[in-house]
Structure formats: C-alpha cells, structure tokens
Design a protein with these regions (language model features):
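Membrane-embedded alpha-helical bundles that constitute the cytochrome b-like, heme-associated redox core
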Residues: 1-176
Length: 176
C-alpha cells in the first residue's frame, strides 16, 4: 500500500499534537482570574492556533504538489466520499478557527506569537469581536465532532476492516 510522504506524515502528527495542546490551554486560561497567568495561557493558545494555521497552509501546499495515496481496495464510494468530506471540513475549520481567533485577540491590540514577534492588531470593533467569538465557538464544536469522526473512521479501518489504512500515515516499520 502506498503511504503519505514523510513530510505529509510529520505535518499531520504535528498538527494533531498542536491541537491536543491548544485546547487545554484555553480551558486552563478560563480557570484563572484576569491577570498575568490567564494572559500567559491565552497567549499559548493563540500562538498554537497560529501554528496550526501555518501547518495547515503547509499541508495544503504539500498536498497540492504530492497527491494522497489511494484508499485500500474495497473501501467503497460512500466511505471514500465521507473521508474526503471529513478531511475537507477539517482543513476548512483549521483555517477558519485561527482567523476568527485572530479577529478576537487582535481586536484593539497586537497578538503575540510565542513572545517572539507580535502580529499587528487593528482598531477595536465590538461587533466584529462578538461575531468572531460566535463563529469560533460553533467551529470548536464542529471540530470536536469531525475529530471524533476521523478517529472513529481510523478505528473502523484498523479494527474492523484491517485494511492497513492507518499505515499510510505512519513511518515504515523496520524489523527488529
């Protein structure tokens, strides 16, 4: 079975790891009163969100130049269509959410990126901040559902179909 390239695999797993970090960062931030600790955790969340956005842009650029391997034989048109739809929606959300996050965080102030550089903010616009927050929250729940669907599809291929689909996104195994 053909595999994704090493770069595609690395970007996939780095994106997954960044998502696993940025979600708890905002949950932690919400549990602190306004102050420097809360600001730190929000900055970490925002910086990871920007990182996810950059990784998704790199993934899409790489994917445009390097086609994905085909699905295992017998996958079926419905399953392939569902996989394509899920991947497309995941990419879309992972591009939209950092933008809405920036529209919230940069609304009246600069947005620090890992305290290395500041992304320029823009003049405060109350309505824009409220709209961006609403879209961000709705996308958050859609993202949870799509991640669950993505993982469930992988488990189905590994445990039920046993068709080697997961191995496409893993480095080759060397014999011991």
């Amino acid at each position: 079975m053909l595999r994704y390239t090493g770069i595609a695999q690395a970007l996939h797993w780095l994106t997954a790891a960044a998502l696993c970090l940025l979600l708890p960062f905002v949950w932690v931030a919400e549990n602190f009163p306004p102050g420097p600790v809360r600001v730190f955790w929000y900055m970490a969340h925002e910086s990871m969100g920007i990182s996810v956005w950059l990784m998704v842009l790199m993934r899409l650029t790489w994917r445009w130049r390097h086609r994905a391997p085909g699905y295992p034989a017998g996958t079926g048109r419905v399953a392939e269509g569902l996989a394509r739809l899920t991947h497309g929606l995941l990419y879309g959300l992972l591009l939209v959410m950092p933008v809405t996050g920036y529209l919230m965080a940069g609304n009246g102030q600069d947005v620090p990126f890992f305290r290395v550089l500041n992304l320029p903010g823009f003049p405060h616009q109350e309505a824009l901040g409220i709209a961006a927050d609403s879209v961000h929250v709705w996308c958050q729940f859609a993202l949870y559902g799509l991640i669950a669907l993505h993982v469930a599809g992988t488990v189905w291929h590994v445990a039920v179909r046993r068709d080697g689909l997961l191995e496409r996104m893993l480095p080759p195994q060397r014999p011991l």
